[in-house]
Amino acid sequence: HFLAFHNSNGGIHGAVSDTPPRLLEEIYGKPFQAAIQESDLLGIMPCYCTVNGEPVSASYGLLTKLLRDEMGFQGLCISDYGAVGNTHGSQHVGETLEDAGLLCLKAGMDMELPNPSGFGEKFLEKFRTGKADISALNRAVLRVLTAKFRMGLFEHPFSLQGEELKGVFSQKTDREVSLQSAKESLVLLKNNGVLPIGSDVK
């Protein structure tokens, strides 16, 4: 969740984050920058937060200037579930839902999940009637198609189905690794006779 999601006021999910620009770049931005530059990160999701008075989903400064221009991100920017609707409904940006969608698109968001609300039919009508610049939509469409091409979805759009697809997500080795991770991450918070340790041991 890009950016400063864990620095929201009161630790509240999706709340306001008053984070100075230097802290955004040098602390909260560094893990993203490393993933982009060292691993060629191809997908990113803006957080629900409002950072310094601006919803991240509709922030040109964060999604284009910082993320793409400064950090070099070239992949697909996908909304968090319902984030475009939240931008309008909760964060009060845009006169209408489609206005909020257009602001998110212009900011650098390419795709809305889980279904189109801000990127819906009225949003598309703005492009059909010339009320919105088609180049912003073309840029987003190109990024979506590029991601699909990289995944081979044009050659094999439904390469795995049914049991074959289920098999990919239920490998025995994956289950074993998950079980081992769970075992190694357990932390005993209070010993009520679970472990054979005397009460005098600290």
Place the predicted regions along the sequence by residue.
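Glycoside hydrolase catalytic-domain context in secreted enzymes
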Residues: 1-202
